[in-house]
């Protein structure tokens, strides 16, 4: 009996020693592998910082120009540019190859073929609802039209900033704005927005909640309206629901990868006077209106200076000018 117990103890002791030896051997092997891989990674990282001839050399058709030899990415060689323009532009140009021509001209400014995308929009309303600002840099050309100054100005405020928006059910609820960054954005073919401020007893202040005719009108037959009311006061709203929608939005901050070029007009529209607009580099500019070819030539000529005032996109590819959250 004692012999069996001694044998059992001896078996477990030998097993423990054997397992310890195996684990120690495996540990040494793992240490060797880890140290070796670390050494290889360090050596490769050092070599990768060396000059890499030809990687960032733009092909312009001529090798006479001296280019700085660098391993850093060029400013535009890995970037995309979206150019948005009204539908009247290609109609006036009347040239099926005008985009190819502009692509070749952008190439002379350092933008490779295939990095510039041309996007047409029919009107301010359609563009404001779904702008599709997908590129690293987005430049919007807006033709100045008398009588549409307000729509253009509010479109600029919309797409030059990022917004977080919720749908509003004005038939069931009262709404209030909680700060300067909180606005109500209405869109449609014809938006008329009326409001009735309420006191703590939900009685109208200067208006009757049961009589829409007594409401104050804050937007009249507009395609796009960014409505601002007194903060921290409940309001009952009325809109032309058949031709308009309204959302409760909060301005998150500037969208620095978007710029607007106003085409024509005596003065450039200025949105920096808005108290919700933080001090920032001006990304609205104006070019003289002559012909659309002249406008595009001007854009190509100054494209790099324009982009210098912008910041490259940092959000997802599928980013619009406002986020719609249910």
Swiss-Prot record:
Protein species of origin: Rotavirus A (isolate RVA/Human/Italy/VA70/1975/G4P1A[8]) (RV-A)
Protein task: Calcium-binding protein that interacts with rotavirus cell receptors once the initial attachment by VP4 has been achieved. Rotavirus attachment and entry into the host cell probably involves multiple sequential contacts between the outer capsid proteins VP4 and VP7, and the cell receptors. Following entry into the host cell, low intracellular or intravesicular Ca(2+) concentration probably causes the calcium-stabilized VP7 trimers to dissociate from the virion. This step is probably necessary for the membrane-disrupting entry step and the release of VP4, which is locked onto the virion by VP7.
Pfam families tied to this protein: VP7
GO cellular component: host cell endoplasmic reticulum lumen; T=13 icosahedral viral capsid; viral outer capsid
Cellular compartment(s): Virion; Host endoplasmic reticulum lumen
Annotated segments matching region GPR motif: 253-255
Family from the record: Belongs to the rotavirus VP7 family.
Keyword Ligase: no
Positions bearing carbohydrate: 69
Coiled-coil boundaries: none
Binding site for Ca(2+) 2: 177, 228-229, 231, 301
Disulfide bond entries: 82-135, 165-249, 191-244, 196-207
Higher taxonomy: Viruses, Riboviria, Orthornavirae, Duplornaviricota, Resentoviricetes
Subunit structure, interactors included: Homotrimer; disulfide-linked. 2 Ca(2+) ions bound at each subunit interface in the trimer hold the trimer together. Interacts with the intermediate capsid protein VP6. Interacts with the outer capsid protein VP5*.
Domain of life: Viruses
Note: Some rotavirus strains are neuraminidase-sensitive and require sialic acid to attach to the cell surface. Some rotavirus strains are integrin-dependent. Some rotavirus strains depend on ganglioside for their entry into the host cell. Hsp70 also seems to be involved in the entry of some strains. In group A rotaviruses, VP7 defines the G serotype.
Keyword line: Calcium, Capsid protein, Disulfide bond, Glycoprotein, Host endoplasmic reticulum, Host-virus interaction, Metal-binding, Outer capsid protein, Signal, T=13 icosahedral capsid protein, Virion
InterPro entries noted in UniProt: VP7 (IPR001963), VP7_1 (IPR042207), VP7_2 (IPR042210)
Annotated region (CNP motif), positions in chain: 165-167
Leader sequence residues: 1-50
Sites where the protein binds Ca(2+) 1: 95, 206, 214, 216
Protein name as annotated: Outer capsid glycoprotein VP7
MF terms (GO), sorted A to Z: metal ion binding
PTM annotation, UniProt: N-glycosylated.
